[in-house]
């Protein structure tokens, strides 16, 4: 099984080589042609990627671990890397994760219900996941869960505000500009873009794509993905005192 797995994936058709820096392209090409001459061409392993089955009506899951804090995650099926909804979701991620976010201000600062709060998006060739998460005192898990649901519902109904979108756009573009100053980071990003089918020039379109997202886009995407019927909730709590003493 390991040999078959290696044969299927470790082939030229599934590989991308990214070289950034002060190099001579002709010499680099010759070097890699020599080094990988014996690698089989193979075939693309992910031409037809199955989409995950949408979930609905799942009961919240709870786990008890040897931790002092409680952690809550509320997840939704997300977008794929090739989906036009991915960028509005990226902006929603940024707007929901910094110290100026509605979640931070309402849940942590105003209500004192969380230690940290944010959002994260995971994308692949198949639709991934979008998560809202927080850490809190185990005694506050019920009120903070209620408030988190309420804030997500408001986001699903109204999308981002003008201030949130402007801030998120500036953060996203600024962060990428800083990361791309590193040859290794820029090269890795371009390699992944090519592997995912976005093309080596995807970064050239990136700024315009982000700047073109409107408030209506965020409202449409939030309503599409953050449906309470398809929400998956997971909570991690400290050990149950009753069961631990028995």
Positions of predicted regions on the chain:
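His/Glu-based metal-binding/catalytic segments typifying zinc-dependent metallopeptidases
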Residues: 44-102
């Amino acid at each position: 099984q390991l040999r078959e797995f290696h044969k299927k994936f470790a082939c030229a058709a599934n590989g991308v080589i990214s070289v950034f820096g002060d190099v001579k392209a002709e010499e680099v090409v010759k070097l890699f042609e020599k080094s990988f001459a014996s690698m089989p061409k193979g075939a693309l392993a992910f031409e037809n990627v199955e989409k995950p089955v949408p979930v609905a009506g799942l009961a919240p899951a709870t786990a008890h671990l040897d931790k002092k804090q409680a952690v809550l995650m509320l997840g939704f099926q997300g977008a794929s890397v090739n989906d036009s909804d991915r960028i509005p979701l990226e902006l929603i991620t940024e707007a929901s994760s910094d110290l100026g976010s509605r979640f931070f201000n309402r849940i942590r600062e105003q209500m004192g219900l969380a230690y940290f709060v944010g959002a994260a998006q995971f994308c692949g060739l198949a639709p991934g996941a979008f998560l809202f998460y927080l850490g809190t005192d185990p005694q506050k898990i019920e009120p903070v869960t209620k408030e988190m649901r309420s804030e997500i519902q408001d986001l699903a109904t109204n999308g981002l505000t003008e201030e949130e979108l402007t801030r998120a756009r500036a953060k996203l573009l600024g962060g990428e500009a800083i990361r791309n100053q590193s040859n290794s980071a820029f090269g890795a990003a371009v390699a992944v873009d090519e592997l995912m089918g976005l093309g080596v020039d995807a970064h050239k379109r990136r700024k315009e794509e982000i700047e073109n997202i409107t408030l209506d886009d965020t409202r449409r995407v939030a309503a599409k993905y953050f449906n309470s019927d398809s929400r998956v909730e997971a909570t991690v709590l400290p050990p149950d005192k009753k069961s631990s003493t028995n």
